[in-house]
A protein has these predicted regions:
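Bacterial N-terminal signal peptides
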Residues: 14-24
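Extracytoplasmic/secreted proteins, especially bacterial periplasmic and envelope-associated proteins
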Residues: 30, 34-41, 55-70, 84, ...
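Active-site-adjacent substrate-binding region
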Residues: 222-329
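A non-catalytic alpha/beta surface segment that caps or lines the substrate-entry region
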Residues: 40, 50-107
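C-terminal recognition in membrane/secretory proteostasis and scaffolding
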Residues: 291, 310, 319-431
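Bacterial N-terminal signal peptides that target proteins for export
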Residues: 2-15
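Sec/Tat signal peptide C-region and signal peptidase I cleavage site
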Residues: 25-29
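Acidic/histidine-rich catalytic neighborhood of metal-dependent amide-processing enzymes
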Residues: 95-100, 128, 139-240, 260-264, ...
């Protein structure tokens, strides 16, 4: 090689290296852009809130199926290609509604472990136009409830997980599932598990029975991350889950709050009810929850990227662990949450415990209710109620159970760096 050729080679490297460097950069940005586009479509006015059985529900399911088909994932139903990714079901007593779960599979590459399946899921339905009995926090106001965080955010992350694991195939098989009618009482996840209990020669690429499902990971409301914090429930439902979650968090820079049991108001509860270990990821509640204001512009897309990175690490560990995940029955930490109280403060606390600051954050303080009238605001971190400390949700519920209506009690909160005390006049809780 002569000197001129050496110069040419060096020049090529000088040019090529920056090009290679810049070629890597768009990857994360592209994923965020893809997730943003998914959220913006699913939470658009055009889809009308994605209520089961409506035109918006159909458009949402078609959008997701098109994505899965473009990724060349395996369908689950024999016969017509158009219905290959749909598990249809009908529910309701007074009014029958037909909708579906959307399901696709990435087969595992290990000849033994590929017969064990992990479900990675999110629900794609929402509240439609809201109204009385819909679950809306503004039941007297009819309007599209877009459901950007609940749960277009989860759908966007699960689609990116499907893209990732299609390329980086895992040892175990992964079922990617988008549940219908979750807001109606976890209907889709329950219907899927009932389907898996039955013999059906129209199924394909799924385990022969429910016993082939060894774990479930659920993502619901993962679009409003704060302070790089996330709640992971179900960490006690299998021996290694807590250590795996902590390792994934350390690798991705997340601060996680681990909740041992897998119960709660989302689809993982259907799986833990039939003794399948679960992990439930969420970034928690907010003022826009179940209102027309849950729109795409309120989401933290950098945080969704962090959720995606964390989920990849967690699922990779889960899909490659040599032993089958064991199931451990964990008592529900929700017991006190469903107790009846004589009073209400009129706030929604951070039930996931995602805040790293001591105390219990008031995620939503309802206008006109006792806490709001006293001066407490969303984001305040409760330190004491009636002179007794509040460190977590259980202590909050315990304090609430001790209070009587038509009394006034001090509530101490941390707001920024200031410790404030408000006198709250308690009103009777609705029966």
């Amino acid at each position: 090689m002569n000197i001129l050729n050496k110069v040419k080679v060096k020049a090529k490297w000088v040019i090529a290296l920056p090009l290679c460097f810049f070629a890597v950069l768009p990857s994360s940005a592209q994923k965020q852009d893809d997730m943003r586009q998914t959220v913006e479509y699913l939470a658009s006015q055009k889809l009308g809130g994605r209520y089961p059985g409506t035109a918006g529900d159909t458009l949402a399911s078609e959008f997701i199926v098109d994505k899965l088909r473009s990724l060349k994932l395996k369908p689950v139903v024999k016969g017509k290609k158009k219905k290959a990714f749909y598990h249809d079901f009908t529910y309701g007593k007074e009014k029958q509604i037909t909708t579906h779960n959307i399901i696709a599979v990435v087969p595992g590459k290990d000849k033994h472990l590929r017969n064990e399946y992990i479900v990675v899921g999110s629900h794609y339905d929402h509240l439609g136009m809201g109204g009385q009995g819909s679950g809306s926090r503004r039941p007297d106001t009819l309007g599209v409830h877009p459901g950007a965080d609940d749960n277009a955010s989860g759908d966007a992350v699960v689609l990116e997980l499907a893209r990732h694991f299609k390329k980086a195939r895992s040892q175990r098989s992964i079922i990617f599932m988008f549940f219908g009618a979750e807001e109606q009482g976890l209907v889709g996840s329950k219907q899927f598990l009932e389907w898996m209990k039955q013999e059906d020669n129209q199924r394909k690429n799924l385990p022969d029975s429910m016993k082939g499902i060894v774990a479930m990971v659920n993502l619901d409301m993962v679009g409003r991350m704060r302070d790089s914090a996330m709640s992971v429930s179900g960490t006690g439902t299998s021996s290694r889950f807590k250590a795996m979650a902590e390792q994934a968090a350390a690798q991705t820079g997340l601060h996680i709050s681990c909740v041992p049991d897998g119960y709660g108001p989302s689809d993982q509860a259907s799986f833990v009810a039939v003794d399948i270990p679960v992990l439930f990821l969420t970034t928690g509640g907010h003022m826009e929850y179940h209102t027309p204001d849950d729109v795409p512009s309120t989401l933290n897309y950098d945080g969704m990227q962090q959720t995606l990175d964390f989920s990849k690490e967690l699922i990779t560990q889960l899909a490659s662990m040599p032993e089958t995940p064991d199931y451990i029955s964990v008592p529900s930490s929700q017991t006190m949450k469903h107790a009846k109280f004589k009073v209400t403060l009129g706030l929604m606390p951070d039930v996931m415990g995602a805040s790293r600051i001591p105390g219990l954050r008031a995620d939503i303080v309802v206008a006109g209710k006792p806490a709001h009238q006293a001066g407490i605001r969303s984001g305040d971190i409760i330190q004491e109620i009636d002179g007794k400390p509040v460190k977590d949700m259980n202590e909050y519920m315990e304090r609430l159970s001790e209070l009587q209506p038509d009394t006034t009690i001090p509530v101490k909160v941390l707001r920024g760096e200031k410790m404030l005390t408000f006198q709250v006049h308690l009103t009777p809780a609705k029966k």
